[in-house]
């Protein structure tokens, strides 16, 4: 799915911050992430070791760096090498590795914080998801945190498979989990945002039109 997007010029414009709809979605997600971290007493990322599973071209890690994470404490893995090369150009101090989420090239208990932003939904095999979840738990320190951001339903794309709260809970059975339904469904956002940004924010606040879950998952 990500390889297809990489080759699709229209998709590049669609996911650009110069697209008002994409900007709305990204800023909304960032506000929700900051609120969640603050709620759990995390207001300084500079001393945290952080890894993203499925880091792509580095966009999310750049956002995390902008929030105060130390560039040399960032790590990431991805299977698409061209995207990884772009991430290395953007984040020269980060440790970015061509690797599979089922076999992470890190020691156990390596990270304070792990991120997965729409990696699970791009995996169609339940066994692969389970293996990746186990690896995430392995590399997290005791009481370490996984932040998961993924959609629970995407009926328009057969190359992805939404991951609802019940499935996330099954993947991380011995963890503390907290779910927040966020992100105005992109098809609706594409209609509403160009017409009225405040209306889009109001609709998103209702949650019934939201397509993603932001999940705080803490290892016991």
At which residue positions do the language-model features occur?
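Conserved alpha-helix/loop element of class I SAM-dependent methyltransferases that forms part
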Residues: 26-46, 63
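Conserved beta-strand signature within the Rossmann-like core of class I S-adenosyl-L-methionine
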Residues: 143-150
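N-terminal, positively charged/glycine-rich alpha-helical extensions of SAM-dependent methyltransferases
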Residues: 1-16
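A short acidic, Gly/Pro-enriched loop at the edge of an enzyme's catalytic core
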Residues: 102-114
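A short SAM/SAH-binding and catalytic strip from SAM-dependent methyltransferases
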Residues: 113-127
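A short glycine-rich, Lys/Arg-flanked "PGG" loop and its adjoining helix->strand segment in the class I
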Residues: 130-142
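Short alpha-helix
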Residues: 160-175, 179-180
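Class I SAM-dependent methyltransferase SAM/SAH-binding core
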Residues: 51, 57-103
